[in-house]
Amino acid sequence: MTSSRFIITVIGSDRVGIVARITTVMASYNVNIVDISQTIMQGIFTMIMLAEAPKENFDLAAFQHAMDAEGKSLGVEVKVQHEDVFRFMHRI
């Protein structure tokens, strides 16, 4: 399968349902989690995922909008960056 990889970060106050609701949006866009790290630091929820989506017929803008909207409804910040952009921004 030809695919695109993304880094997805989620940060905000911890509450019930963050993982469930974020991953539900991901599944609706056929986005697969390749790797995940999640922790709660003094009540602050943090999660970073390496995710993969099919290149064919995948609407990145719509996915980003859906993730942002779900994040806002949860009171957390969700960022979706293509892996290449993330690597370029975080290189030393």
Curated annotation (Swiss-Prot):
InterPro entries: ACT-like_dom_sf, ACT_dom, UPF0237/GcvR_regulator, UPF0237_ACT
Domain ACT: 7-81
GO cellular component, one term: cytosol
SUPFAM superfamilies listed in its UniProt record: ACT-like
PANTHER family attached to this UniProt entry: UPF0237 PROTEIN MJ1558 (PTHR34875:SF6)
Listed name of the protein: UPF0237 protein MA_3235
PROSITE patterns: ACT
Organism of derivation: Methanosarcina acetivorans (strain ATCC 35395 / DSM 2834 / JCM 12185 / C2A)
Biological processes annotated in GO: DNA-templated transcription
NCBIfam families: PRK00194.1
Pfam families with a match to the protein in the record: ACT_6 (PF13740)
The family this protein is said to belong to: Belongs to the UPF0237 family.
